[in-house]
């Protein structure tokens, strides 16, 4: 399992539009993707579950990937989270 930390830089947090982009990208990987924040852990491949984390601007989260492409998945998804600006 590979874990990468990311900080939400988007002014409006991880609202529906960037969250759906994240989920779409996460589904491209064969690895299991899990997002952890504030002691909660949810599937990174579920928009509904991701929204339950209430990921606001400045919040730290942990992207966990387990599977064949775990290293690239965790790295690219962490970069994606930090690339969102709105």
Curated annotation (Swiss-Prot):
Matches recorded under Pfam families: PTS-HPr (PF00381)
GO biological process, one term: phosphoenolpyruvate-dependent sugar phosphotransferase system
Keyword Transferase: no
Database matches in PROSITE patterns: PTS_HPR_DOM (PS51350), PTS_HPR_HIS (PS00369), PTS_HPR_SER (PS00589)
Residues of the HPr domain: 1-86
Catalytic residues, chain numbering: 15
Superkingdom of the source species: Bacteria
InterPro entries xref list: HPr, HPr-like, HPr-like_sf, PTS_HPr_His_P_site, PTS_HPr_Ser_P_site
Keywords: Cytoplasm, Phosphotransferase system, Sugar transport, Transport
Location of this chain's protein in the cell: Cytoplasm
UniProt similarity note: Belongs to the HPr family.
Function in brief: General (non sugar-specific) component of the phosphoenolpyruvate-dependent sugar phosphotransferase system (sugar PTS). This major carbohydrate active-transport system catalyzes the phosphorylation of incoming sugar substrates concomitantly with their translocation across the cell membrane. The phosphoryl group from phosphoenolpyruvate (PEP) is transferred to the phosphoryl carrier protein HPr by enzyme I. Phospho-HPr then transfers it to the PTS EIIA domain.
Protein's name in the database: Phosphocarrier protein HPr
């Amino acid at each position: 399992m590979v874990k990468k930390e990311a900080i939400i830089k988007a002014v409006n947090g991880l609202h529906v539009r960037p969250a759906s982009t994240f989920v779409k990208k996460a589904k491209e990987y064969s690895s299991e993707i899990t997002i952890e924040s504030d002691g909660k852990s949810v599937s990174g491949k579920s928009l509904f579950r991701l929204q339950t984390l209430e990921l606001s601007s400045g919040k730290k989260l942990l992207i966990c990937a387990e599977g064949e492409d775990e290293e690239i998945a965790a790295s690219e998804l962490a970069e994606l989270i930090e690339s969102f600006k709105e």
